[in-house]
Regions:
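Short secondary-structure transition/capping segments
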Residues: 17-22, 120-122, 151-154, 181-183, ...
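Active-site neighborhoods of metal-dependent hydrolases
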Residues: 51-55, 60-87, 93-114, 159-162, ...
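Core domains of carbohydrate- and sulfate-ester-processing enzymes
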Residues: 41-50
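Active-site environment of divalent metal-dependent phosphoester hydrolases
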Residues: 13-16, 113-117, 145-152, 175-179, ...
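Metal-associated gating/positioning segment near the N- to mid-region
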Residues: 1-37, 41-42
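Amphipathic alpha-helical segments in well-structured domains
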Residues: 48, 125, 154, 185-189
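Divalent metal-binding pocket/active-site signature
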Residues: 99-159
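Short hydrophobic alpha-helical runs that function as membrane-insertion/retention elements
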Residues: 5-8, 109, 140-141, 169-171
């Protein structure tokens, strides 16, 4: 493919700087993305400087850069607890951001759709990113919602970049859900045009295919992801809590990215499964697995997450080829992105 450079740490999910207090929790949360670390000397690193030192010791065939994940930074300070940061915690975040940039991080990545970053509101993001104010240091972002609430999600991050006067890069732009195909991309690019006219530096990338990939636990509504893996598994083991989750997932939402409602279980595939019970179903859709198990697909989802302790990645067919081609024609702003390159 002619790749010369790999930039790690996207979507707020970087392996550094994790700090030391919540290192175990962060390692567990990221394990479905980072893979099995049993044969590695280390995986999650407390500081960006330690990551850079380890990187220099590796033989690499391509250039390598690193973004400091805002999700990892926040988790290193507060764990996966809900609520706003205290003043002391905000200052800790600032210190880690500054240390990471000084150590060689290219910028800061956000994953506002993921735990724990979905705890930030718009003003909380502005506060957390204060060390970048007025600089040319880029912020890349997996926006809060790529489905029904995509316009609100884009307005949120454009507003943050505009107030801080920093460059903004939107990661893997797409419009999820058939009801959002066709007209929505036109409205999305209009937002970019309006922001650029006001002097905001904003661009985006997309991958040239129709299937995305992320953690299967991301299907759960944000309020049911709070507290980290142990708390999530406790909820999934509770039948009354399962019913509450299902009730939310069956409704459209512009507050969170409800991929279950937007794509359907037929288009959501469990791509990595490790337990004896589910290993043979890897690569199959949740709907297909549920059919073979003769159970409701919602319960299949919860059973998989519980058995695998949320360490599952998924593939989800969510985009439109016509929309993809429309975005690709926006040559002044577009770059092509290939995800999950190992």
């Amino acid at each position: 493919q002619g790749l010369t450079t790999v930039v790690n740490g996207n979507c707020g999910l970087s392996v550094a700087p994790a700090g030391e207090k919540f290192e175990k929790e962060i390692a567990g949360f990221l394990s479905s993305v980072t893979g099995d670390s049993k044969n590695r000397e280390t995986e999650i690193m407390s500081t960006m400087s330690s990551y850079m030192s380890a990187l220099q010791k590796e033989e690499r065939s391509v250039n390598t850069g690193m973004l400091a994940g805002n999700g990892t930074i926040r988790a290193g300070v507060k764990g996966y607890a809900s609520g706003k940061l205290s003043k002391e915690e905000v200052h800790q975040v600032w210190n880690v951001v500054e240390e990471s940039l000084a150590a060689g991080a290219l910028g800061i990545s956000l994953g506002i759709a993921y735990a724990p970053e979905f705890e930030y509101d718009r003003d909380g993001l502005v506060e957390a990113l204060q060390p970048l104010k007025g600089t040319d240091i880029p912020v890349t972002v997996h926006i809060r919602n790529e489905g029904d609430g995509i316009l609100l999600a884009l307005q949120e991050v454009i507003s943050v970049a505009e107030e801080l006067k920093i460059p903004l890069h939107v990661s893997h732009l797409k419009c999820i859900g058939k009801k959002n195909w066709g007209e929505m991309p036109v409205r999305v690019l209009k937002l970019f045009d309006q922001a650029a006219a006001r002097g905001v530096k904003v661009d985006f990338d997309l991958y040239p295919y129709l299937t995305g990939s992320t953690q299967l636990v991301h299907l759960l509504p944000p309020q049911f992801q709070e507290g980290g893996t142990d708390a999530i598994c406790a909820r999934l083991a509770d039948q009354s809590c399962r019913r509450k989750i299902t009730k939310v997932l069956k409704q459209p939402s512009d507050i969170f990215e409800n991929i279950v409602e937007l794509a359907g279980f037929e288009m959501i595939y469990a791509s990595t499964l490790h337990t004896e019970k589910f290993r043979s179903y890897a690569g199959q859709s949740i709907a297909k697995i549920a059919e073979q198990l003769e159970q409701d697909p919602y319960d299949t989802l919860y059973d998989i997450l519980l058995a695998e302790r949320c360490q599952v990645t998924m593939l989800d067919t969510i985009a439109s080829e016509e929309d993809m081609l429309y975005f690709l024609k926006d040559s002044p702003r577009i770059s092509i992105f290939f995800s999950w390159i190992n």
